[in-house]
Amino acid sequence: MDVDAEEKRHRTRSKGVRVPVEPAIQELFSCPTPGCDGSGHVSGKYARHRSVYGCPLAKKRKTQDKQPQEPAPKRKPFAVKADSSSVDECYESDGTEDMDDKEEDDDEEFSEDNDEQGDDDDEDEVDREDEEEIEEEDDEDDEDDDDGDDVEEEEDDDDEEEEEEEEEEENEDHQMSCTRIMQDPEKDDNNNDEYDNYDELVAKSLLNLGKIAEDAAYRARTESEMNSNTSNSLEDDSDKNENLGRKSELSLDLDSDVVRETVDSLKLLAQGHGVVLSENISDRSYAEGMSQQDSRNMNYVMLGKPMNNGLMEKMVEESDEEVCLSSLECLRNQCFDLARKLSETNPQDRSQPPNMSVRQHVRQEDDFPGRTPDRSYSDMMNLMRLEEQLSPRSRTFSSCAKEDGCHERDDDTTSVNSDRSEEVFDMTKGNLTLLEKAIALETERAKAMREKMAMDAGRRDNLRSYEDQSPRQLAGEDRKSKSSDSHVKKPYYDPSRTEKRESKCPTPGCDGTGHVTGLYPHHRSLSGCPHKDRVPPEILAMHENVLKCPTPGCTGRGHVNSNRNSHRSLSGCPIAAAEKLAKAQEKHQSCDVSKSNQASDRVLRPMCFVKQLEIPQYGYRNNVPTTTPRSNLAKELEKYSKTSFEYNSYDNHTYGKRAIAPKVQTRDISPKGYDDAKRYCKNASPSSSTTSSYAPSSSSNLSCGGGSSASSTCSKSSFDYTHDMEAAHMAATAILNLSTRCREMPQNLSTKPQDLCTARNPDMEVDENGTLDLSMNKQRPRDSCCPVLTPLEPMSPQQQAVMSSRCFQLSEGDCWDLPVDYTKMKPRRVDEEDPKEITPEDLDPFQEALEERRYPGEVTIPSPKPKYPQCKESKKDLITLSGCPLADKSIRSMLATSSQELKCPTPGCDGSGHITGNYASHRSLSGCPRAKKSGIRIAQSKEDKEDQEPIRCPVPGCDGQGHITGKYASHRSASGCPLAAKRQKDGYLNGSQFSWKSVKTEGMSCPTPGCDGSGHVSGSFLTHRSLSGCPRATSAMKKAKLSGEQMLTIKQRASNGIENDEEIKQLDEEIKELNESNSQMEADMIKLRTQVTITTMESNLKTIEEENKVIEQQNESLLHELANLSQSLIHSLANIQLPHMDPINEQNFDAYVTTLTEMYTNQDRYQSPENKALLENIKQAVRGIQV
C-alpha cells in the first residue's frame, strides 16, 4: 500500500503545480470558516484564504475547544496473518465504539507490539518501498492510459520525471519489483478495461479524492518526522494505518467548512444516481472510516510494520501541526463513506458492486499466500480496497465462503455495467477531476505552509536552546522537559508557544504588510496598521482599552520610544520612570552627607538651556561658559539625578539634618546684594526638601516663575523667594524628588554684613534667634512645621505658605552650598521693612503669599535676564527643574495657561516625520518636515493669536544661510548662526563686546525654571516670555490638576508681572509695531492683488472689444455681399412678371423673394404650361448670378 500512497503523493504535488485551476472552482478558494472575511491568514498576502489551516478564527476556536489529552500510540497491524473471522470481529467491535474508545483500545492492544518491534526493520522497509515506487507507478500509468483520463495522463509525465531522480534506487530492488509484477497479472486483466460503468467510475474518482486527502496528511506527518533527525520513521506501505494512529491524537473538526462544502459537493454528485445521504454523514464518516481501516489493517496483515516508541513521544509535540490537517482526514473518510453508500444503493439496480467485491476477495485470497512482510503493491490495490469497502458482504461474511459465488458473477456484472452511456461517463469524470484538482492545489499550498513554519520553528528552537542554558527560567519550562526532544522542530502553533498565538494584525483585510513599527510580516496591534481605518468601532475600542500603558494615571503621551497614542509597557513611560527614580532616591537616604558634597556642581548648570548664547552684562567681562551638549544631556541628567543626600529619621514636627547642595561660584556685585545675603528660609527640613521635586537646581520654592523675583550676588549674596508661592505649589506637584535642596526665605532684614553667622561649617543649622546648632544630628521639634510630604505627594498652598513664612539665618559658608536660580534675579531695597509672619488661617494661598513681601519698586515677575552679572555662569539663565528630562518636560507642560495639545505649530502637520524624536506630535518648527522654507508661520501671541511673526535668524544681517543646525532657509536663533559665531570671535580678538542682538532680547526668556525656550507654542524666538505657551508649564499644570480659581490666580500673577516689567512692556510695544507693520504689508498685498485683478479685467475687456470689432467687420462684409446679391437678383428678374405682383424692385424685394420661394417649394400647384414656362424663365434669369 505504500506504493499507492507514494505514487499518489507525487502525482498530487505535480497536479498542484501543473494543472490550472478553472474558474468554476474558484469559490473553493475562499475561507470556509463562518464569520471569516479572509483577513489575518498566516500563510500570505492574499485577501482571502482557502482553508481553515491558516484561518485565525478557526485556530482560535480549536484552541479554546481542544482539551489536553495524552498522546496515543499509533495503531500497529499484527505481524501475523489474521483469518477472516477475526477480521469480522474486529470490524464489528470497532464500528460500534466512538473515537475515544478506539484510542484506548489502540493503547492497550498495541503497546506490547510497539515495544517488540525494532527500529531497523522500519528503516529497511521504508527504503525498499521508496525504491520500488517508480516500478509501481508504471503499473498505474498503464491503467490510467486505458481509462483515458486526461488528468492522469498529465500525471504520468510527472511520474517519469521522478523516475529519473530515483533511478539508482530502483535498480537495487528491481528483482523484487519484477516478482511483484509477475504475481499481479490477473488483477491487471480484470481492471484494465475502460470504465464504461458509471458507478465504477464514481468509485474510482472517490478513491482518488480520499487518497489525495489521505496523502496530504501522511506527507505532513512524514516530513515532520524527517526533520526531527530521529532514526525512526513512519510506515509508508499503509497510509490508512498511519491515519488511524494519527486520529487517536488529533482533535478533528468534523464541522469544518472545508469538510462541509466537500460533502455537499459529493452529495450533489450522489443525487445524480439516486443515492440519498444522511445529514449526519460528517459525524458518521469518521467512525466508519476508522472501522473500515481497522478491517483493512486486519486483512492486509502483511502490510503492517512495527512502530517506534520514540515517534509516539514526539507525536505530542507535533499534534498541533496535524490539527490543521483534520479537515483533509475527514474528507477522505467521507469520500469512502459516500462510496459505500453508493454501493449499498446500487445493488438494487445493478449487480456490479457485489461483483467487484467478489472479484476482490478472489484476488485477495489468491494473493495472500505469496506475500511477504516487505511486499509492495501497485496502484491497482486502490481499486481492490475500494471494492472491499463498497461490498457490505466483505464485512459480514467470510471471504472463503464467498469465493465460488464471486467467480460465477463476473461476466454478468460486466455486461450490465457496459450499458452506461458514454456522455454520463464523461460528465461525471470531469466533475470529479475538478474536485481532485482543487484538493490537489490545497494540499500543495498546505505543504508550502508547513515547510515555512518548520523553518521558523527551527530558528526559534535554536534561540530557546540558549535560553535553556541561562539561569533565568521562562514561564514555559515544560517545553524543555524532554532532553531528547530539544532538537525537534516544533510547529508554529505548538501549544507551548503561547506567545506566538494570534500574532497577526486584527485589522480586517490586512495581510501584515506595511506595518509602521516593525520588520515582521505580521503585526499584532492596530496602532501601526496602515489599514487602521478599516477597523470596526467595536474592535478599535477593544484594542484601545487593551493597548494602554499600565501606569496608573498615564494617558499614553510622552512615551520615549513610541509614536503611538498609547504605550503598552512601563519601559518608556515617563511617569513610571519618574517613580522609579524616586524609589532609587529613597534608597540613598542613609548615605553619608559627604557624598553630596562630592557631587559635581554641574547639577546646577542649566543643562536644558543648550541654545542660550552668552550675553555680556552691563560692561562686565564675559565668562566663557561650559555648555552641556544636547547629545549628552540625558546621560548627565541621569547621572546627577542619582546624587545621594542624607536624611535622619524625622516626624511631622522635627527637623533632620539639612542636606548640602554643591557649591555655585558667584561674584559680589553690590552692597545691597551683600546685605541681603543673610536671609534664608527657615524651613530647611527634609519635609520641605522632598517637596521641591522639580527644583533640583533651585534653592527656593521658585521652581517656576510668574510673579516672583530673587537676587543673587556672590558668596554673600541674598535670595528673596518670598513671592514664589506659586512656584512652590508647582514644585509640590512634582513626580520626582531628585533634589534635596533647602527652601529658604528671608526673615530678618539687616544692612550689615556682620549679621551673618561667623561659623562657616556648612552642616550647621541656625535657629530663628541666630544661634548656631553645633550638633550635627540633633533634632529639634518645630511646632510651626508643616507635615512631611512624600516625593509624590502634592503640597497644599497652606503648607507652602507656612513653609515660606518662617525664616532664619545660615552661616556664610552656606551661601556657597545653595543652588542659585538666576532667572529670578532682581534688585532689593536695603531699607525695606521686615515682612510679617503669616499663618494659614489668614492667608490666601496664592494672593497673600505672593503679595506679602512686595516692596516699592519691586517687580513680581522676574527679569528674564539678571540685571546684574551674578557669576561666571550667569549666561546660563535657565536651570532644569530636575535631573530627568522626561520629568522636566511633563511638569513644565502642565503649567501652561491653555490646555492645548503639544502639537507642531505648523499648519496641517500631524506630527509625523519629525527629525528629532519619536513622539506622536512635535512642538516646534525646528524639526518639522512641513515647515515652510520661507520662514513665515502663524504665531499665537497674547494679544492676537492670528498675528504672524518671522522665524528668521535674530542676528542682524543674517539671511539664514549656513545655519549649522538645520536644513531650512531661515534659522531662528544665534546658536548655530555662522555670522554670530564670526562676530563673537572677532569681539574676543579685538577686546570689544559682541552683541548679536539688542539688549531687549535679554528679556525674552521663559519664566519657567529650567526652560530653554524650545517648543513654545506661541513664539518663534529662542526663548519665550510667558507661561502661556510654555510646554513644560503646561505639563506640570496638568499633573497638578489645579482648580479653575488657582489657574486664574496664576494667570493673573503672570499678567501682572508682564505689565510691571518695563522691558517686557518695551517688547510688547515692539511686537505691536511688528504687528502693525505686518498689517500694513498685508494691506499692501491686498492692494497689489486688487491692482493685478483690475489689470487682468482690463486686458480681458480689451480682448473682448477686439473680438467684437472683428465680428462687426464680418457682419459688414456679409451685409455688403447681401446687398450685391439683392441688386443682382433684382436686375436679373426685372423682365419677369409674376402673377398678381408688380415688377421686382427694392421695395417689394422681400415679398418677391418669398413668392419665388413658395413657387419652387410647391411646384405641384404650378403644373400649368404658363407656370412651368414662368419657372423656367426664372431659372434662366437667375443662372447667371454669382454667389
UniProtKB/Swiss-Prot annotation:
GO molecular function: cobalt ion binding; DNA binding; DNA-binding transcription activator activity, RNA polymerase II-specific; DNA-binding transcription factor activity; DNA-binding transcription factor activity, RNA polymerase II-specific; DNA-binding transcription repressor activity, RNA polymerase II-specific; metal ion sequestering activity; retinoic acid-responsive element binding
UniProt-annotated binding residues for Zn(2+) 4: C904, C909, H922, C928
InterPro entries: Myelin_TF, Znf_C2H2C, Znf_C2H2C_sf
Gene3D superfamilies associated with the record: 4.10.320.30
Entry-linked Pfam families: MYT1, zf-C2HC
Modified residue annotations for Phosphoserine: S251
UniProt keywords, alphabetically: Chromosome, Coiled coil, Developmental protein, Differentiation, DNA-binding, Metal-binding, Neurogenesis, Nucleus, Phosphoprotein, Repeat, Repressor, Transcription, Transcription regulation, Zinc, Zinc-finger
Tissue spec. comment: Brain, testis and pituitary gland. Expression is higher in the brain than in the testis and pituitary gland. Highest level expression seen in the developing CNS.
Location of this chain's protein in the cell: Nucleus; Chromosome
Amino acids binding Zn(2+) 3: C549, C554, H567, C573
Biased composition annotated in UniProt, kind: Acidic residues: 89-172
Disulfides per UniProt: none
Zn finger (CCHHC-type) start-end: 22-65, 496-539, 540-583, 895-938, 944-987, 997-1040
SUPFAM superfamilies named in the record: CCHHC domain
GO biological process: negative regulation of transcription by RNA polymerase II; nervous system development; neuron development; neuron differentiation; neuron fate commitment; neuron fate specification; positive regulation of transcription by RNA polymerase II; regulation of transcription by RNA polymerase II
Chain positions covered by the region annotation Disordered: 1-20, 56-178, 221-248, 343-422, 450-509, 684-708
Basic and acidic residues: compositionally biased ranges: 362-377, 401-412, 450-504
Coiled-coil ranges per UniProt: 1055-1131
Protein family per UniProt: Belongs to the MYT1 family.
Subunit comment: Interacts with SIN3B.
Functional note: Transcription factor that plays a key role in neuronal differentiation. Acts by specifically repressing expression of non-neuronal genes during neuron differentiation. In contrast to other transcription repressors that inhibit specific lineages, mediates repression of multiple differentiation programs. Also represses expression of negative regulators of neurogenesis, such as members of the Notch signaling pathway, including HES1.
The protein, known as: Myelin transcription factor 1-like protein
